[in-house]
UniProtKB/Swiss-Prot annotation:
This is Protein translocase subunit SecA. The keyword Ligase does not apply. PROSITE patterns: SECA, SECA_MOTOR_DEAD. GO terms for molecular function: ATP binding; protein-exporting ATPase activity. One of its GO terms (cellular component) is cell envelope Sec protein transport complex. ATP binds at Q99, G117, E118, G119, K120, T121, D631. Belongs to the SecA family. SMART domains: SecA_DEAD, SecA_PP_bind. Keywords: ATP-binding, Cell inner membrane, Cell membrane, Cytoplasm, Membrane, Nucleotide-binding, Protein transport, Translocase, Translocation, Transport. It catalyses: ATP + H2O + cellular proteinSide 1 = ADP + phosphate + cellular proteinSide 2. The lineage of its organism: Bacteria, Pseudomonadati, Chlamydiota, Chlamydiia, Chlamydiales. Disulfide bonds: none annotated. It comes from Chlamydia trachomatis serovar A (strain ATCC VR-571B / DSM 19440 / HAR-13).
Length: 969
């Protein structure tokens, strides 16, 4: 039925394109009409359109004229030089109809899928211009600084010709210039630069003058699938060095390495013994039918199954798995042990290992044997890794009648500190094991200049400046024997998912989005529109070539490279990691094939390498770095030879990454071809392929070195990729559900902080905090007054110690009502506050000689006090939330929903945070003592006072002393 309706009415994509096509015709008509205008007359269109918007016309109504203006300017600029990255380039671009289609879609809030070379950069200029007419912030988000700078200089020239201002944010942009950049009509920059400025404005700035942003209206994200999907699980974090250096990584690194060594040696021994049995059959196609021999083979495969749980990448195991029948037998044991009735046998078998490694879920578990071995290694310090039952420990302290209340409190503090130390050591042990067992050099990271540099799993690019969180980075540093740096403390954090939700309007463009359309729709409410190509795509997509083993696959790849190289075709070989790129490079050198390698280790030469990759006879081996954001242009000889030939050495877990690699060739009507070479030992096939795979292999096994190619195998690959994509989508959605809780709290705190920064009268803000504290105290006092063991005198003692007031017990009992008691306490505190700060204000006025300036100084002082406590308590809260997030997963064991538990407990934590902030502010205000000392000063010295207070510097004209706060710090 649906197919019939689609044939009759067209698909939703076709209907949208048809509707937008009418607008394209209007745009072209406007372009033709504007051709008769002079340059000055055309430039005047910008203020005219702005005024019409201010007068109430919608952007949708202005779209045809605005886009027509941009197209006409592009036509007028043809042949003129534009300086881009220090070079003069000749402008040669006028938007095609398909580009105008994409531009209309982006203004409407779509993600436009446009193929490589179709001109996404120029397409974005039109919606940028249209939305900039509002005077609101308009941002173009790129994947790196180079593209931001290039696009601003190149296509930004159109916007500047029309009288708009453009700015570019790069990592080196100084703070003092960022505010001016954000004032521009259109700003180019990376997601991290925009995101970090948002965090700095809301967590680092201590005055409104230090804030640089001016809001979030419209953003176009280039390579939107990379930013919102690949990077979705990587939050932006502003952090600083932690207060203490955790020595656990240095102390335990050798012992952990030894434990992993024991595991490796044990697995090697088991594998070697199994191979002795299996060696005679590795070169045969059919296993013997003798019952005793088959029993021995089965037991050897059972032993290798155990090896797969201890060292999944063991060489003997991988060699044996090349034989389809032996591979099927190992997998049969895996199915056997996973059956419910065989769980006890499985646990008994696994107990012989020190550590069980779950490669599929990227996890591991220390067995009882491993724990005993660990205890033996650390000797008497074993209990340092045993978690304490805090409820039981506290109960023992309470039951001890010999302890005074003060002693009990001190004991509880000591027990809590001991528990914290044990958790830190246990966490350090787990991260060291993770570093050794699951993190691989030249795949997950590289070692460079005594540092661990993360490799982005999707782009293959080094991520300098980024660090793995939760101590994993320190654990890898210990593993690789580089300098172990201090753990960082988080000051502010936000995920890209929630950052981009701040924009009123969001759009994007990429060459690969349709496979993730469901996620864009459900999480961001963004729809994907596939825009037709300007010229037909001439790429030849060859069927995938499947080989039994990795060894056969590489032999076939080299043979294919040699064959294509003889024809003069430029060749781009895509690899999944630095390790594979270097391995293939060694093989090519052995075969005397000149080539260039592009990976995370030599990314600085990327532009130079890519520039030469389209020349006739060029051979380039690259990681996923070459799969996105690169445009390989062919010379005439290369086009004549058949264009760029793309060879994939494996399928990525995401179909998008494969499509990106294919998209490097056959750009804008050029010839080209793409082919993937796969083996059944590839990670994707090994971990995520269908169980039917072994049956297929046994039936279709070809002779050594011969490829298999069948639509059935293509479906297997697609099924495996969909399975991984579904799992990753679930993880991202799950992460977002937790971050949504944090996001609401973040927005509340940032709104409070901004109110303080922008408040004109901080005395009013301070009194509001006093009233909140008074209400909290009223609840506490009245709740305690009705308790069996009333400690009202202790509360009053604490109150009189913290604040310069004394409560009247009889008055409190007479009032009885929470609101009345809160008003009573609030009046006392506000009266004391007024007395204190009125005297201070009078003293400042006398010294300065200006009541307005004295008021300004007092406002700055109050603002600094309030902001400092918001920031300090928020940092502590972030740590508490991280701990809660890591612990709440265990609640599922008790049949509780971890997310519901997280929401409930985080709400209680947030209530405590707000209370703690307010109490800390009010206590500080009453403990604060300030004095201004007369000195020789210039007339412009007053602003220096406020600045010096913020920076805690010594300053000359007046001396500011803060006392009474040491106990709080």
């Amino acid at each position: 039925m649906m197919d019939f309706l689609k044939r009759f009415f067209g698909s939703s994509q076709e209907r949208i394109l048809k509707r937008f096509q009418k607008l394209v015709e209007e745009v072209n008509a406007c372009d033709e009409k504007f051709s008769s205008l002079s340059d000055d007359e055309l430039r005047k269109k910008t203020p005219q359109l702005k005024q019409r918007y201010q007068d109430g016309e919608s952007l949708d109504k202005l779209l045809p004229e605005a886009y027509g203006v941009v197209k006409n300017v592009c036509r007028r600029l043809a042949g003129t030089p534009v300086e881009v990255s220090g070079y003069h380039q000749q402008w040669d671009m006028v938007p095609y109809d398909v580009q105008i289609l994409g531009a209309i879609a982006m203004h409407k809030g779509f993600i436009t899928e446009m193929q490589t070379g179709e001109g996404k950069t120029l397409t974005a200029v039109m919606p940028l211009y249209l939305n900039a007419l509002t005077g609101k912030p308009v941002h173009l988000v790129t994947v790196n600084d180079y593209l931001a700078q290039r696009d601003c200089e190149w296509v930004g020239s159109v916007l500047r010709w029309l009288g708009l201002t453009t700015g570019v944010l790069v990592s080196g942009s100084p703070p003092e210039k960022r505010k001016a950049i954000y004032q521009c009509d259109v700003v180019y920059g990376t997601a991290s630069e925009f995101g970090f400025d948002y965090l700095r404005d809301n967590s680092i700035a201590t005055r409104k003058e230090e804030q640089v942003g001016r809001g979030f209206y419209f953003a176009i994200i280039d390579e939107i699938d990379s930013v919102l999907i690949d990077e979705a699980r990587t939050p932006l974090i502003i952090s600083g060095p932690g207060e203490k250096h955790n020595p656990v990584y240095f102390e335990l690194k050798d012992r952990v390495a030894e434990l992993v060594y024991f595991q490796r040696e044990m697995c090697n021994h088991i594998a070697i013994e199994a191979r002795k049995v299996l060696d005679p059959f590795l070169g045969t196609d059919v296993l013997p039918k003798d019952k005793k021999v088959m029993e021995a083979i089965s037991e050897a495969c059972r032993a290798l199954w155990l090896v797969s749980k201890g060292m999944p990448l063991n060489r003997v195991l991988r060699r044996v798995r090349e034989h389809p029948d032996l591979r099927a037998m190992i997998d049969k044991w895996d199915v056997f042990y996973h059956a419910e009735q065989n769980k006890e046998q499985c646990l008994e078998k696994l107990s012989s290992l020190y550590i069980v490694v779950d490669e599929h879920n990227n996890d591991f578990e220390l067995t009882d044997k491993g724990m005993l071995q660990w205890i033996e290694k650390i000797g008497g310090a074993a209990e340092d890794f045993v978690m304490m039952d805090m409820g039981h420990e506290y109960a023992l302290i309470e039951e001890d009648a010999t302890l005074s209340p003060a002693d009990k409190l001190n004991r509880k503090i000591a027990v809590s500190e001991k528990d914290t130390q044990r958790k830190a050591r246990a966490h350090g042990l787990r991260q060291l094991l993770r570093a050794h067992l699951l993190m691989e050099k030249d795949i997950d990271y590289i070692v460079r200049d005594d540092q661990i540099v993360i490799i982005d799993e999707h782009t293959g690019r080094p991520q300098s400046g980024r660090r793995f969180s939760e101590g994993l980075h320190q654990a890898i540093e210990a593993k690789e024997h580089v300098t172990i740096r201090k753990e960082s403390q988080t000051f502010a954090t936000v995920t890209l998912q929630n950052f981009f939700r701040l924009y009123e309007k969001l759009a994007g463009m990429t060459g690969t989005a349709i496979t993730e359309s469901r996620e864009f729709k459900e999480i961001y409410s963004l729809y994907v529109l596939q825009v037709p190509t300007f010229k037909p795509c001439l790429r030849i997509d060859h069927n995938d070539a499947f080989y039994m083993t990795e060894r056969e696959k590489y032999q076939a790849i080299v043979a294919e490279i040699i064959s294509a190289h003889r024809s003069g075709k430029p060749i781009l070989i895509g690899t999944e990691s630095v390790e594979v790129s270097e391995k293939l490079s060694r093989i090519l050198r052995q075969n005397r094939i000149n080539h260039t390698v592009l990976n995370a280790k030599n990314h600085a030469q990327e532009a130079e390498i890519i520039a030469g990759a389209g020349k006739v006879g060029a051979v380039t081996v690259a990681t996923n770095m070459a799969g996105r954001g690169t445009d390989i242009k062919l010379d005439e000889e290369a086009v004549a030879a058949g264009g760029l030939y793309v060879i994939g050495t494996s399928r990525h877990q995401s179909r998008r990454i494969d499509r990106q690699l294919r998209g490097r060739c056959a750009r804008l009507g050029d010839p080209g071809a793409a082919k993937f070479f796969l083996s059944f030992e590839d990670r994707l096939m090994r971990l995520f392929a269908s169980p039917k795979l072994n049956t297929l292999i046994r039936h279709f096994r070809p002779p050594e070195g011969e490829a298999m190619s069948d639509p059935m195998f293509d479906r297997l690959i697609e099924t495996a990729q969909k399975r991984v994509e579904g799992r990753n989508y679930t993880i991202r959605k799950h992460t977002l559900e937790y971050d949504d809780v944090m996001n609401k709290q973040r927005q509340t705190i940032y709104a409070f902080r901004n109110d303080v920064l922008h408040a004109e009268d901080l005395f009013v803000v301070a009194k509001e905090q006093i009233e909140h504290v008074a209400l909290a105290l009223a609840f506490l006092i009245l709740k305690d007054a009705h308790a069996d063991h009333c400690s009202l005198p202790k509360i009053e003692e604490w109150l009189s110690y913290s604040f310069p007031v004394k409560l009247d017990d009889q008055e409190i009992r007479r009032l009885g009502d929470v609101d009345a008691v809160a008003d009573y306490i609030g009046d006392l505190l506000i009266e004391a506050f007024d007395v204190k700060f009125s005297a201070m204000l009078a003293e400042f006025t006398e010294i300065i000689g200006s009541a307005a300036n004295a008021q300004g100084i007092c406002n700055d002082i109050l603002r600094s006090v309030i902001i400092s406590h918001i920031d300090e308590e928020w940092k502590v809260h972030l740590v508490d939330m991280d701990l809660l997030r890591s612990e709440v997963g265990l609640r599922s064991v008790g049949q509780k929903d971890p997310l519901i538990e997280f929401k409930n407990e985080s709400f209680l934590l947030f209530e405590g945070l707000i209370r703690d902030i307010r109490i800390a502010i009010v206590k500080h205000l009453f403990a604060l003592e300030l004095s201004l000392t007369r000195s020789d000063r210039p007339d412009n010295a007053i602003p220096t006072v406020a600045t010096a207070f913020h920076n805690h510097d010594n300053f000359r004209p007046m001396e500011l002393t803060i006392v009474g706060e040491e106990e709080e710090s």
